[in-house]
Amino acid sequence: MLDIATFSVEFTEKALGHLESFRGFERNIILDAIKAQLPHQSSQETRHRKLLRVNPLADWELRVQAFRVFYEVDPENYVVRIIAIGHKQHNTLFIGGEEMQL
């Protein structure tokens, strides 16, 4: 029998602020994707999750349509920590209304 641990998902204060900046239906899309994608095997690359190269923001990215969820995984404590949430317009990433470079 295969036992797959379930990770709890935590949001930083900044990430909660980023989430609040989106419209209600956008928040629902983002939260539904987080619930579906991150509690199980959150550190396994998939079509929507990827390990990022070294950057000051986070280790992992979850792509949800034009939205990006940046997170870190703590495998010892079974925690996924959401660091930032933004959206992409063409090749430009915006987090908290500011353009970001990764």
Language-model segments: residues:
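Short histidine-centered beta-strand/loop micro-motifs
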Residues: L19-R23, E61-R63, E72-D74
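Arg/Lys-rich, positively charged N-terminal/basic patches that mediate binding to nucleic acids
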Residues: M1-A33
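Active-site micro-motifs of SAM-dependent methyltransferase domains
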Residues: G17, A36, H40, H87-H90
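A short, surface-exposed loop/turn module that caps and links secondary-structure elements
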Residues: A36-E61
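Residues at the C-termini of beta-strands that transition into short coil/loop
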Residues: E13, N55, G86
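Enriched for short, Lys/Arg-rich terminal
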Residues: M1-T6, N28, V64-R68, E72-L102
